[in-house]
Amino acid sequence: MKKIKTILNNNKGWLITTASLIAVFTAIDITTLCVPFITNTLNTVFGDDRLVLKSGDPNRYQYYKTDDNIKSKSDALKYANEVNERIGEEGFVLLKNDNSLPLKKNAKVSVFGLNQNNMVYSGSGSSSKSNANGIDLFKSLDNAKISYNKTLKEYYNKLKSKYGRPASPTFGDIIDGFPTGEAPLSAFNSNNPSSMSGEYLDAALVVISRIGGEGYDLPRTMKNIDGADSNAHYLELDNNEKDLLKNLTSSSSPFDNVIVLINSGTSMELGFIEDGTYGNKLKGAIWIGDPGGNGLNALGKILTGEVTPSGHLTDTYVRDFFTIPSLKNFGNNARDKGNNYTVDGASTDYYFVDYQEGIYVGYKYYETRGYTEKLKGNASWYNENVVYPFGYGLSYADFSYSLKEITLDNETISSKLYESDLDKKINLKLEVTNISSTYFGKEVVQLYSSAPYIDGQIEKSHVNLLDFAKTKELAPGEKTIVSLTTTLRKMASYDYNDANKNNHKGYELDLGKYSLSIAKNAHDAWNNPIFEQDFSLANTLNIDIDEVTGNKVENKFDDVSSHIKTYLSRNDWEGTFPQTPTEENCEVSNDLIESFSVESYIGKGATLDKGKPWYVSKARRQQYVELTDEEAKIKLYDLIGKSYDDKKWDELLDQLTVKQMTQLIGTGNFNTGAISNISKPKTTDPDGPSGFTNFMTMIDQTATVYDTCFYACESLIGATFNKELAYKVGNAIGNEGLIGNERGDKRTYSGWYAPAVNIHRTPFSGRNWEYYSEDGVFNGIMASETVKAAKNKGIYTYIKHFALNDQETNRDSKGLVTWCNEQAMREIYFVPFEYTVKIGGTTAIMSSFNRIGSVWAGGNYNLLTGVLRKEWGFRGMVITDYNTHPEYMNPDQMVRAGGSLNLIQDMQPASSGATYNVTHRSALRNATHDILYTVANSCAMNGYGEGIKYVYAPSYWKMAIYSLNAVALVSMIIWGFFSIKKSFNSDEKWYNLQKISTCLLTVLKVVVYYY
């Protein structure tokens, strides 16, 4: 023993180093491998654990399959890119064409605008993607054999570093302006860009780009921005762009054909295209949205006439954005404190937004007001305010129309309808003929309704979109039949406050004249319809029962509706027009602030859950100790295809512990967790509206989500007005999801954080590029097609963001407090979600950051259970938005309200403590049921069945940590061996392994004990 002490004293350097390394590696290992939040974060960033087959033949259990021609990831990407290029072909909108397009064969063009080398392919944020390997403007021109001015291109390339658009704003930014990235005229010789045209004079293409992104809204001021007026806003031309257009369209310019390319996922002020500001040389304009990775290839085809444009706008393009009613209550309203609630003059942590405009959003305002102003003799009002109506789009071809039939459940429709006709299908068949002698083309027709309005009673838009259809490609002289379908129920209005005093609140159809019109756009629906059919009702219809579930429909948000005292009314536009909140409007009582707390909603102590709609007095028991694989007899694959209410679900859920349930619910970070004893696999559920992506991934080689299609923005997909193409998007996503992680463990991408279906409440919302349009019905129709197709491939789609998530500013500052009346909720903001549930069949929803009234949307029982689950019959899981704010996005409140999954690396609902009781345990069980039901009916179960056994092998980053541990351990042992060796003299036979081993054993015991 004395000798050992001597040896150890002689080797203090080795001992101290070894002890230090053990301490360091222990800390690293505990932090990275034992703290779920960090472990799950590293899994997301560097790659997840790998699924390894242990026994059985998974090929026996393939429940979902790719298309026959899709065999690999490259096949899936090729098909998806073809779909995306078609989105460009059918979505780019021809806004103006004074015989400027198509260009002549072998045309020579000059491209102007500094953003030509920094175009916007998608918005920024968690679902953005890179276009490094995509198709840019010049490759599109090359592919179309259009020659372009390379000298001019190179000149712009040199200007980029000095004048180009800066990096996108980041999450939470409130920006007082943002540079467009355009160069001033002073950057050119003699301040004259047109002088650089050379022989490339067939057209001047002018690129105008605007970005958008998650976490910030677009600025309504350009304060302190070079090249812009401080009183201008981001979505109009800045001075540099105006100067460029003036130069190119001046009498001294060599160009006679200037064509503007609008590269923006949201609408812009485009009055300059039509009002003659730039004379008669500005002859053409095309809106191209954000085209994704290869969508821009369609532009060259459209410029040459190989493809006839057939896109239509999904927003009303307004001449002056500051006339938009909803803009009076949006973002920070250019106030220093924004819409910040104050108590006794002191700021709080809460911000609010008032939807004072009610139902009058987008075309519902401009078409209704245009109609009422015309009745008053002010017919010029509409053109003074609107540049392009919703649904507008030009074509190279011309079309004629002939109505073939209009029927009610296949019978001739009567001029008077009854309650028994409420859900019968009204079908209109229209013959469309291409009367062009030259151009092939596709045409869009749109179906609108108009309901009787009674002064001072239920608010009604003069026109409402019901349906739309797009023809196949028609050759010159070719004709086809398109069908448009609706029901009487879809023409109902929601009377949230018994405005017509008939003692009924809910959906109603008033007596009076109703009209159905087929038109090219929302304005033509009442001003110049292709076809119009009038009918009346035998009596007022009050609708109390949901047509799908048979459940009662009734007000759920009276407290929210009543907060705003005056909503915009067509009975008095001027007197009820929204007003920007003043400091007085921001002052509230402390009682209101206290009502925002979690405790005020779910209760606490003796009041916890008492009198709440989610309260239960009994709940089934859970296991105390986790069952082994053999003890858990019911597996998740036994429930594939079973209804949500099948009794076997209880048998499955009875096998789980509370800990298993809370871990599943609390770790939904782009996945759902594995539960091995019931054969529930871990899933991969990536973002987003641009296609499968994961913004947290840092190493491409270990990423589980890679080599996927970069799809066009949803506003461009919407502009196709093509349901069949929206279905193809879902099918392409489905094929990509089924191939999944081809180079890794072959795990599918079974979930998708998309489509996003919020509306364009204002043009300034940062995420408008992620949403289809300003109209809820339109969004619902398009998204439902994508959802159906993806579901057919086993992909569950998290439809987001439910609900009233229409601005980014202060979105998660303890939950933006959103006030709105229930009519607008049910006629506009809820509709796309309702469609995707009832028509699309989605089994996943993402809730939103904001509050609806005082209650967080993701923990709002009336929203998630009352409307979504009970009224609409939704079955599946509801995930939160990314949850870094547990102070209000509380998982205990979430599960009580009907939420299921927390989008965070690790934030579990309670499994003990102040909020844990029988009601809570029942809520955990319901949430687990929701998640398991969704996953059971998805491609995540491919390869799972009787006799199949998988294990999870450590991810590569974990293997790296294990390897470092091993290398360090071996190094210390070798060092220790030779260090101790020196402590023996030659007579003591240093090679006596027993003595050396005794010295090393102290270290080894510690290491072995640790591992």
Identify the function of each model-found stretch.
Residues 1-503, 507-518, 522-523, 554-1011:
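Glycoside hydrolase catalytic-domain context in secreted enzymes
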Residues 524-558:
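Short beta-strand elements
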